[in-house]
Amino acid sequence: MGKIALQLKATLENITNLRPVGEDFRWYLKMKCGNCGEISDKWQYIRLMDSVALKGGRGSASMVQKCKLCARENSIEILSSTIKPYNAEDNENFKTIVEFECRGLEPVDFQPQAGFAAEGVESGTAFSDINLQEKDWTDYDEKAQESVGIYEVTHQFVKC
């Protein structure tokens, strides 16, 4: 199956360097079995800090899962070196923020939640624990004396 990139697109207001924080950041995904096409009905999360051994000593992955329909064992790995911030210059354009090594599991949907951080463009003010579940986030930058926000968060998956 190979590598699949998650691309983010958003409208940033006086904000830059939007990024997931820490190895415990939860990437909430819905997965599709590459063998039979079964799509999970529940959100599942994968984290950098999780490592599960693959059968037969073939390494490890962020998640290993047996398909409920065809019983095939599939896996997905977060490629830590590919995690990139979404910056002010990326505003309203799709940008790859992470890549996944997919072995039988294909992500088909993404639900951003809590755990993002960003900074004020002019002031550098740090904003932590940004929750994007509602696809919008607003706050006020005291240093710059201006409102800040992240709006219209959308995503797409592309094969690398």
Curated annotation (Swiss-Prot):
Superkingdom field: Eukaryota
An example Gene Ontology molecular-function term: zinc ion binding
Positions annotated to bind Zn(2+): 33, 36, 67, 70
Keywords from the named record: Metal-binding, Phosphoprotein, Zinc
Pfam families found in the cross-reference section: CXXC_Zn-b_euk (PF05907)
Residues bearing PTM Phosphoserine: 75
Domain text: The N-terminal and the C-terminal half of the protein have a very similar 3D-structure, suggesting they arose from duplication. Requires a bound zinc ion for normal folding and solubility.
SUBUNIT field: Monomer.
Family: Belongs to the UPF0587 family.
Protein name: CXXC motif containing zinc binding protein
Organism: Homo sapiens (Human)
Upper lineage: Eukaryota, Metazoa, Chordata, Craniata, Vertebrata
